[in-house]
């Protein structure tokens, strides 16, 4: 019998990696119904889909993860078979080794097979995060595509291609109902909307022009979000000698538009993302604290403070009185 794991073993040194490397022995018998998806922060973020088949895990690397709807196919690169023990593997593969980087289980569960040939695989996944009918089909060599055959999950909305930022009204006086606003610094930086999907970033300025290449350092933020899709509003600000993306609003979160949600709720979801990295952070906000925030802005030489009504929706492209800019 051919050793299905020969290629797998040849690529790994048991003295250097904690990955399971079983001896060449008879393969365990299973029911060909186990799947696992592992998020793999290697040189390039991707998700490894592994399907139990004939005692091994037949594997594909999917750079953008599973497609959420039938309208989009994603690349799936057929890789070497992995041992069944790999279904439980999580950890750090040493840099310099094959697949070096952090890996963890994104989802696992059962699957049923509708069709399995050398060029096409139709399956139904039943996991905690991944469910539905998918087909994998070969296009050329190791390159396959994965297509979702079922409709998207109820309530899912596609990520927009762009969002033109909402703009504040400049005022000299503090609003009488200042306690109904969340107050934050106006940084005087470059306004930028970040669209993140499948660990990939598209960055646009206030006019909608793409500026991703000019700010490639921010791609690490997109990778830090993993499979979560999001649209963020913020500013690129020079802090500590380097540009930093300061996130101040969340407009779309993992298949759901938040434009109609009140700012207070959007803000809570933004904080839930815990965006904090070497070149990105969440802008602090202080509900009702306008005078203290304005005084601090003046002391730090910032141009002003921005107030957002806690009950206000996000109005793309509009100059709205629901947002107030007060000069320092």
Please report, for each region that a protein language model flagged, where it lies by residue.
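Catalytic cores of nucleic-acid ligases and guanylyltransferases
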Residues: 1-328
């Amino acid at each position: 019998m051919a050793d299905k794991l020969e290629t797998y073993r040849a690529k790994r040194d048991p003295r250097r990696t904690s990955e399971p490397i079983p001896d060449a022995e008879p393969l365990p018998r299973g029911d060909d119904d186990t799947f696992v998806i592992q998020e793999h922060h290697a040189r390039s973020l991707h998700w490894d889909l592994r399907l139990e088949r004939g005692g091994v895990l037949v594997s594909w690397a999917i750079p953008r993860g599973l497609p959420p709807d039938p309208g989009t196919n994603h690349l799936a690169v057929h890789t070497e078979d992995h041992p069944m023990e790999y279904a439980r593997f999580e950890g750090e593969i040493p840099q310099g080794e094959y697949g070096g980087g952090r890996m963890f289980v994104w989802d696992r569960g059962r699957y049923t097979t509708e069709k399995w040939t050398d060029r096409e695989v139709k399956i139904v996944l039943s996991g905690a995060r991944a469910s539905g009918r998918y087909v994998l089909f070969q296009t050329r060599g190791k390159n396959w595509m994965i297509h979702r055959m079922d409709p998207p999950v109820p309530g899912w909305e596609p990520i927009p291609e762009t969002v033109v930022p909402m703009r504040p009204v400049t005022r000299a006086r503090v609003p009488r109902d200042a306690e109904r606003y969340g107050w934050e610094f106006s940084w005087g930086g470059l306004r930028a909307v970040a669209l993140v999907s499948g660990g990939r970033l598209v960055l646009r300025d206030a006019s909608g022009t793409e500026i991703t290449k000019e700010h490639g350092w921010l791609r690490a933020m997109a990778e830090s979000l993993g499979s979560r899709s999001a649209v963020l509003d913020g500013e690129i600000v020079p802090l500590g000698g380097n540009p930093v993306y300061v996130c101040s609003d969340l407009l779309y979160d993992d298949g759901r538009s938040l434009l109609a949600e009140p700012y207070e709720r959007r803000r809570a979801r933004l904080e839930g993302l815990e965006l904090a990295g070497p070149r990105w952070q969440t802008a602090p906000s202080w509900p009702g604290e306008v005078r203290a925030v304005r005084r601090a802005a003046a002391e730090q030489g910032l141009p002003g403070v921005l107030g957002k009504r806690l009950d206000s929706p996000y109005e793309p492209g509009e100059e709205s009185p629901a947002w107030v800019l007060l000069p320092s």
